[in-house]
A protein has these predicted regions:
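Acidic/histidine-rich catalytic cores and adjacent linkers
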Residues: 1-6, 10, 16-20, 39-221
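Short alpha-helix plus adjacent loop in nuclease-associated cores
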Residues: 18-39
Length: 221
């Protein structure tokens, strides 16, 4: 339908959703690896069971660190952390977690390379990394990589242009908050007037047209 209405439009995939897709794939892999440490074998000793529980809790507690750019993970916050006996930094926690599984480790560093290529707006480099790893990376990334390949031209546009859905989505969220904090509006014109006021769109003390839209008795209804 979009192509019919806007036949000459340049389609751009929002960059946020590209990174979100990578993060979701990595996080799903993290969950699969984590669950492995929540399984107890009949041959496990008490010490082994305790070790598994500790690693499981580490994955569950520090999962957000795995989704950050590596250079954004602190190397200076040396101190006591939950589920670690020794003092440790956030960067060391990441290394500890990815060292629990080679597939996770490979996927983590592949994702980091994709982040770098994406941030540098390096379209060719981005897809070279995908092509080089699509047959060897964890299964959680298969659908994501195939989707990227099927939408190459749109992703290229995302890296070429600075346009984004962010401002529009921000406006939509603000309107939703206005409606929520007002406990709903029975009168559409009252809601419209409140939106105009909040966004400073045409409202002034002398604007009779906007004033006529406002049902003051029902403004917060």
């Amino acid at each position: 339908m979009i192509k019919d209405i806007f036949p000459n439009a340049t389609v751009i995939i929002d960059r946020f959703h590209i990174i979100q897709a990578l993060n979701n794939s990595l996080n799903n892999l993290r969950i699969r690896v984590m669950k492995r440490f929540n399984t107890i074998s009949k041959d496990d000793t008490k010490d082994k069971i305790k070790e598994k529980e500790q690693i499981y809790n580490q994955f569950k507690t520090y999962w957000k660190l795995l989704l950050k750019r590596e250079d954004e993970v602190s190397i200076d916050d040396y101190g006591k952390k939950d589920y670690f006996k020794q003092w440790i930094t956030s960067r060391e926690i990441v290394k500890h977690l990815i060292n629990q599984d080679e597939v996770l480790k490979d996927a983590y560093y592949t994702t980091q390379m994709l982040y770098d290529a994406f941030d540098a707006r390096n379209y060719k480099g981005f897809f070279n990394i995908i092509d080089s790893n699509i047959n060897t990376i964890a299964e959680e990334f298969s659908a994501t990589f195939k989707t990227f390949i099927n939408n190459k031209s749109y992703i290229e546009n995302s890296l070429r242009y600075n346009l984004s859905n962010g401002p529009i989505e921000g406006i939509i969220n603000k309107v939703k908050n206005i409606k929520r904090t007002g406990y709903g509006y029975r009168n559409f014109f009252s809601l419209k007037a409140r939106v105009l006021i909040v966004f400073n769109l045409g409202y002034s003390n002398t604007d009779r047209n906007v004033k006529e839209l406002i049902d003051y008795d029902n403004l917060a209804a």
